[in-house]
Amino acid sequence: MRLSRRSFLRSSSLAAAAAGALPALAEPRGETGKPSPVKLGMCSYTFRNFTRDQMIPFLKQLRMNELNAKDAKDHLPVDPVQEAAAVADYTANGIRLHAAGAIYFRQNSDDAIRAQFEYVKRAGIPVIVAGDPTPETLPRIEKFVKEYDIKIAIHNHGPEDKLWPSPLEILPDIQGMDPRIGCCIDVGHTVRAGTDVVEAIHRVGPRLFDMHMKDLTSFTDKESQVAVGDGKMPVREIFEALTAIRYPGFVDLEYEVHADDPMPGVIASIAYMRGVLTGMGYRE
C-alpha cells in the first residue's frame, strides 16, 4: 500500500527518520538496518537554473554524491576543456557522475553519434540517458555501444512522445540488440502513458539502467508534479520492484517544478524516499 506523506509522518519509525531529514539533511544518517539495495541520485536538470558552483553546495546539503549530469548551465559542458574542469570540480567534492543526459541523437551519422560518446567517455560516465534515438538510428548507436562499452538508456517521455511513450514501447525495438542498450524509466511519463510503472520495471528487468523519479497528483496531468510523497506515485512498490529485479543503478530525483527555488521540494522528496527505505528496513 502506498503511503501518503501524512501517513508516512504519522508512522513512528518513519517519522523519526523524516523529522531528522527535513530540517537538516546534512546530519549523519542512522546506522540501523541493512544497506539499501536502492541507491538514490540526482538529475542535475533539477538545478537547471543554477550554476555548478551553486549546485554542488545543494548536493552537499542533501548528502547526495551521485549525479546524472546534463549540459544545462555549466553542469557538464560539451567543450572538452570546460568539461574537464567540471569533472575535476565534482571529483574534488566527492560527487560521482553515474549517468549523462538526457542526450539527444538528432543525426543518424557516425560523426554525430561518435561526438556524443566521446563527450561521455571524457567524463568517465558509464551510462548515456538517450532522449530521442529512433529505431532507424539504433543499429548505428549499437556499434558505438560496443566500441565504447557505454550503456544506452532510452528515456521515455509520456503520451506526447510518438516513439517511446513508455518503456514497454522501447522493448520490442531493442530486442536482440546488445544487452547494453536498455531503458531509463521516467516514472512520471510512464504513468501518464497509462502504463503500470511497477509492471514496467519487472518487464524491463536487466535492461533497466537508470530511473528518473518524480510524483504527480494526477496521472493524466503533466503539470501536476509535486514533491515525491505528495502525489499518487507508488514509491514503496517501485522500490520493492527494483529490489526484486536486483536493479544495480540509481533512482535519480528529477524535480522539474519551481525551477528558481527547487530546494524545498527536493528536500521533501529526498526525505520521503529515505524514510520509505527506512520503513523497508534499509539504511541508505
What kind of feature is each model-predicted range?
Residues 2-39, 49-63, 119, 164-185, ...:
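Histidine-acidic metal/acid-base catalytic patches
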Residues 31-46, 87-91, 96, 100, ...:
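Mobile, glycine- and charge-enriched loop segments
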Residues 38-43, 67-69, 97-102, 128-130, ...:
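Hydrophobic faces of well-ordered beta-strands that scaffold small-molecule active sites
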Residues 40-46, 69-73, 94-98, 124-131, ...:
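Short, mixed-charge, low-aromatic patches
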Residues 43-47, 70-74, 102-105, 133, ...:
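Active-site beta-loop-alpha junctions enriched in small/polar residues
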Residues 44-50, 71-81, 160-165, 229-233:
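Short, exposed beta-strand "edge-strand" segments with a Pro/Gly-rich flavor and a Y/T-containing core
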Residues 65-151, 161, 189:
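Structural motif corresponding to the early beta-alpha repeats
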Residues 149-172:
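A generic hydrophobic-segment detector
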